[in-house]
């Protein structure tokens, strides 16, 4: 079935030519209302003209589509978004595509070379995304694409300015993916290889022929569709090839009384990727390191640092809603209190928290799970792993959980000491205390 964008409002920056033009044409072809933004400057950021954007709008309209031109700089992101609001009443999809090049070796780079590239790439994407953000939150829908490049992911000679800004967009995208997830706002990054006004000056003709912008567009349309759940991803794409990129971390080495000499002696092991891990969030990264250190390894021992995962036994499959008491677990008192609060103000809590928790309580060698759904309906809590994928997984001992929830143990301190392990949405973990407000045990 064809992916349809009927009545979706799409902003494409740098849409007067190259990849941006093909984005605009294809979105319009599939029913979207398109804001074609292009300042009309050169690939080095000089000059301006309305011709490029106007021609694309004319082409869209000639094919029966709907589009409007905008000639503002991406630094004036509010004006571009306002064009979408005035013309079509909203904004659903934002393609941060505009870019320039000011390539020069670092020793010859001027402040002007750096600042102009920053203003168009990093600041421009920020200004557009920020201007569109609250409109997307209100609609409970949004799709944002950041455009990085191989120069950002890996570095490239003569592109310290360009590469820095392109990597900055990866960080921005990753954070927006986390902040927007609860409001159905998805943000992904692409690193395209395609012929455009930017690349025609640095690639030979025979290579450019294989790098048509048409090969980039299908991935972007897929990522922007309302049925696509992918968010926080980084993808390299070009010439009919698509690949996902992720961070990889070596197993690492634990050393007591760390010294430069010990670093030197263990360097081969430090940089070995024989047993890598793949953290996907700051919380996973930190909790994995703390878990490794708190395991008290021997000096010089390799420590495999992975995000903590707790296997839930099959016997702990979710029970029907009802009693949340499990014999022998003091945490049952906490969950009973939470269950009462959900019954009294479930809809309010769902609106405030909007997340699903899997809480693994450890007691001796046993682990008992409770699933807390504060995302759907009026909320619910069951004994067991639940049937819905959690947004955050919390693992803690029975005693420490009770102390944290009753205010006797500081959660941040427990996390730092490795007593409290969190994977997934760290922000949701900080909201858990709200379930006990006003309650007494």
From Swiss-Prot:
UniProt entry keywords in alphabetical sequence: Fatty acid metabolism, Lipid metabolism, NAD, Oxidoreductase, Peroxisome
Pfam families with a match to the protein in the record: adh_short (PF00106), SCP2 (PF02036)
Ranges of residues in domain SCP2: 331-440
Location in the cell: Peroxisome
Residues reported to bind NAD(+): 11-35, 38, 73-74, 97, 162-166, 194-197
Catalyzed reactions: a (3S)-3-hydroxyacyl-CoA + NAD(+) = a 3-oxoacyl-CoA + NADH + H(+)
GO cellular component, one term: peroxisome
Main localization, broad class: other
Stretches the record annotates as 3-hydroxyacyl-CoA dehydrogenase: 1-302
EC number: 1.1.1.35
Positions of transmembrane segments: none
Pathway listed: Lipid metabolism; fatty acid beta-oxidation
Any one Gene Ontology BP term: fatty acid beta-oxidation
GO terms of molecular function: 3-hydroxyacyl-CoA dehydrogenase activity; enoyl-CoA hydratase activity
Binding-site residues for substrate, renumbered to this chain: 149, 412
Annotated catalytic residues: 162
Similarity comment: family membership: Belongs to the short-chain dehydrogenases/reductases (SDR) family.
Classification via PANTHER family: DEHYDROGENASES, SHORT CHAIN, SCP2 DOMAIN-CONTAINING PROTEIN
Function in brief: Enzyme acting on the peroxisomal beta-oxidation pathway for fatty acids. Protects the cells from the increase of the harmful xenobiotic fatty acids incorporated from their diets and optimizes cellular lipid composition for proper development.
Protein name: Peroxisomal multifunctional enzyme A
Gene source species: Dictyostelium discoideum
